[in-house]
A protein has these predicted regions:
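Mid-chain, well-packed structural core segment of small domains
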Residues: 65-100
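A common structural junction motif
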Residues: 28-33, 69-73, 107-112, 135-136
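Short, charge-patterned binding micro-sites
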Residues: 35-58
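Short glycine-/aliphatic-rich beta-strand segments at the starts of folded cytosolic domains
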Residues: 6-10, 49, 83-90, 113-118
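Helix N-cap motif at beta-to-alpha junctions
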Residues: 14-15, 52-58, 122-124
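Short amphipathic alpha-helices in soluble, non-transmembrane regions
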Residues: 21-26, 62-69, 131-134
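Glycine-rich, aromatic-bearing surface loops/beta-hairpins
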Residues: 91-136
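Long, hydrophobic N-terminal alpha-helical segment
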Residues: 1-35
Length: 136
């Protein structure tokens, strides 16, 4: 497969329906999300949501939802990948609530889901070819 794991995180404010947001996130990743309630600097409660995907079946389902964005991810791979072979993606939280997957650019504002995809790259392997196998 070439992916070790996927980590995703989002936030929801007290005024939002946290249950609805969590359901949408579970649809998006096919995994359960941890909800950690905390208080923001300004006072209202905020839900810190996170999940980790490691199982092949869940990874395959998640990658299938990203399929319309595979060409964009490959084209922007140099900008989105760090030195630890982690691909950083941002998706619109509002679109996921509507069960659509929209990749966001770094300059776009709004509620988002941060996704980090850790690639399995071993000495002698080319990161570009591994990414092409996954997203190609």
């Amino acid at each position: 497969m070439g992916i070790l794991h996927v980590h995703a995180a989002a936030t929801a404010h007290e005024l939002q329906d946290i249950h609805l947001v969590t359901e949408a996130l579970e649809w998006f990743t096919e995994s359960e999300w941890d909800v950690d309630m905390t208080t923001s600097y300004h006072g209202p409660k905020v839900a810190m949501l996170s999940t980790q995907i490691k199982k092949k079946k869940q990874l395959d389902a998640f990658l299938e939802k990203l399929e319309p964005h595979h060409p964009t991810i490959l084209a922007e791979l140099d900008a989105r990948m760090d030195e630890n072979n982690v691909i950083h993606l941002r998706f619109s939280l509002e679109s996921v609530i509507g069960q659509k997957v929209e990749l966001m650019q770094t300059y776009e504002k709004g509620p988002l889901i941060k996704v980090r995809i850790k690639l399995a790259v071993y000495p002698g392997q080319d990161v570009q070819s591994i990414a092409s196998d996954i997203f190609g």
